């Protein structure tokens, strides 16, 4: 039987996922990281992106919006600001959020927080891509 590792994806609101998996690719702050069972211990920041998880020969995606990942003793803990399985993403809601962020960025008002609007746009695009 193939070796597996535990993956726990946790947000401030809930445990999104907590099961044995085969492999995960995570959006590390310095690039993507592939984690197999018995990986060397590691702690890294995560950027907005998509976790790609292989479990039992099948793949699924989880959209994350930053956080941290710890790998130790064939256990992976992802502490994410937000996390949403691709099959649970409301694509229409994500598209609406993308449109709102684009409208904010295109407006010329001084009350617009450009950095915040850019982050919102990036998160919305990530959710849409993860759901595809």
From Swiss-Prot:
SUPFAM superfamilies: Epsilon subunit of F1F0-ATP synthase C-terminal domain, Epsilon subunit of F1F0-ATP synthase N-terminal domain. The keyword Protease does not apply. It is a peripheral membrane protein. It is found in: Cell membrane. CDD domains: F1-ATPase_delta. Keywords: ATP synthesis, Cell membrane, CF(1), Hydrogen ion transport, Ion transport, Membrane, Transport. InterPro entries: ATP_F1_dsu/esu_C_sf (IPR036794), ATP_synth_F1_dsu/esu (IPR001469), ATP_synth_F1_dsu/esu_N (IPR020546), ATP_synth_F1_esu_C (IPR020547), ATPsynth_dsu/esu_N (IPR036771). One of its GO terms (cellular component) is plasma membrane. One of its GO terms (molecular function) is ATP binding. Belongs to the ATPase epsilon chain family. Produces ATP from ADP in the presence of a proton gradient across the membrane. F-type ATPases have 2 components, CF(1) - the catalytic core - and CF(0) - the membrane proton channel. CF(1) has five subunits: alpha(3), beta(3), gamma(1), delta(1), epsilon(1). CF(0) has three main subunits: a, b and c. NCBIfam families: ATP_synt_epsi, PRK00571.1-3, PRK13446.1. This is ATP synthase epsilon chain. It comes from Desulforamulus reducens (strain ATCC BAA-1160 / DSM 100696 / MI-1) (Desulfotomaculum reducens). The lineage of its organism: Bacteria, Bacillati, Bacillota, Clostridia, Eubacteriales. The gene is atpC.
